[in-house]
Amino acid sequence: MGEPIRVLVTGAAGQIAYSLLYSIAKGDVFGKEQPLVLVLLDITPMMTVLEGVVMELQDCALPLLREVIPTDKEEVAFKDLDIAILVGSMPRREGMERKDLLKANVKIFKSQGAALDKYAKKTVKVVVVGNPANTNCLIASKSAPSIPKENFSCLTRLDHNRAKSQIALKLGVTSNDVKNVIIWGNHSSTQYPDVNHAKVNVKGKEVGVYEAIKDDSWLKGDFILTVQQRGAAVIKARKLSSAMSAAKAICDHVRDIWFGTPAGEFVSMGVISDGNSYGVPEDLLYSFPVVIKDKTWKFVEGLPINDFSREKMDLTAKELTEEKETAVEFLSSA
């Protein structure tokens, strides 16, 4: 066993973290040989709840978990980190405009970005989950100029997994049989789930999803809407936002950063758009298809984009540009 790595989870007393921490601590993400120190950050009023989470983690008696550090202080939380998973954000309250939500979160992610810049390792990998995830991630990155912007990514893997699962359900196969779906753009209802390049294994034969499903109107209509609105559907049914599925998606996302993507497969994650070949404006945190090797992601290049896709990709880029402009305005005054 090597040296322990330091992993931070923010919003650590919350729903998603409760599903996530056990998976990380038992080795599902960084492997069964990698010891770790878990650092748990939350706001001061949540410290008592967080103590309960720490007790439970201790009571799991997990061999890889060397230490658990609960804190409400950024200088403790961000010190010498290898990985930061930023789950905590200001939730949208009833009657709250998206603009108000952005303003509250710019403040949080400016502060956390600055703390990463000051205290974390320069090689730290930062994954932003708290919504609006793409723009929060961009703000954190801009507030941490000494950390490469390629080290920042945001979670669209939940949308990616939702898309895989809908295709699998439609065809009566397992999600494992579906690969190379793409989520383009924002983790919002403008995201574009694209299966033009996706493949499915049907009775041992790999075929394109359009060819396998033979229902273009579903693929261009209800399928896209279902994935775009899935989060809202879960809230409506459960009265709480997705936690178990979000935690699983975070594990998938971070494991792929750590160990790389399987040969012949690509995944979706929100990354900085600089240098992309898909006509997405620079300096946006936009979800693309990527492959990962040696902890470094690269865009999947050369995928043909039809007019239907182009329109959807531009629409979500427009929303992200507007979000960014609003956030950057707040950033200068935060």
Swiss-Prot record:
Active site (record annotation): H187
Write down the InterPro entries for this protein, in alphabetical order: L-lactate/malate_DH, Lactate/malate_DH_C, Lactate/malate_DH_N, Lactate_DH/Glyco_Ohase_4_C, Malate_DH_AS, Malate_DH_NAD-dep_euk, Malate_DH_type2, NAD(P)-bd_dom_sf
Reactions this protein catalyses: (S)-malate + NAD(+) = oxaloacetate + NADH + H(+); (S)-2-hydroxyglutarate + NAD(+) = 2-oxoglutarate + NADH + H(+)
What does it do?
Catalyzes the reduction of aromatic alpha-keto acids in the presence of NADH. Plays essential roles in the malate-aspartate shuttle and the tricarboxylic acid cycle, important in mitochondrial NADH supply for oxidative phosphorylation. Catalyzes the reduction of 2-oxoglutarate to 2-hydroxyglutarate, leading to elevated reactive oxygen species (ROS).
What family is this protein classified in? Belongs to the LDH/MDH superfamily. MDH type 2 family.
Provenance organism: Gallus gallus (Chicken)
Q: Where in the cell is it found?
A: Cytoplasm, Cytosol
Please name the PANTHER family in this protein's record: MALATE DEHYDROGENASE
Q: What is its EC number?
A: 1.1.1.37
Which GO terms of type biological process are on file?
A: gluconeogenesis; malate metabolic process; tricarboxylic acid cycle
Pfam families of this UniProt entry?
Ldh_1_C, Ldh_1_N
On subunit structure and binding partners, the annotation says: Homodimer.
Keyword Oxidoreductase listed? The answer is yes
Entry binding sites for NAD(+): G11, A12, A13, G14, Q15, I16, A17, N105, Q112, V129, G130, N131
Protein name (database record): Malate dehydrogenase, cytoplasmic
Native organism taxonomy = Eukaryota, Metazoa, Chordata, Craniata, Vertebrata
Q: Where does substrate bind?
A: R92, R98, N131, R162
Gene Ontology CC annotations of this record:
cytosol; extracellular space
GO MF annotations, alphabetized: L-malate dehydrogenase (NAD+) activity
Question: Which keywords accompany this UniProt record?
Answer: Cytoplasm, NAD, Oxidoreductase, Tricarboxylic acid cycle
HAMAP family on file: Malate_dehydrog_2
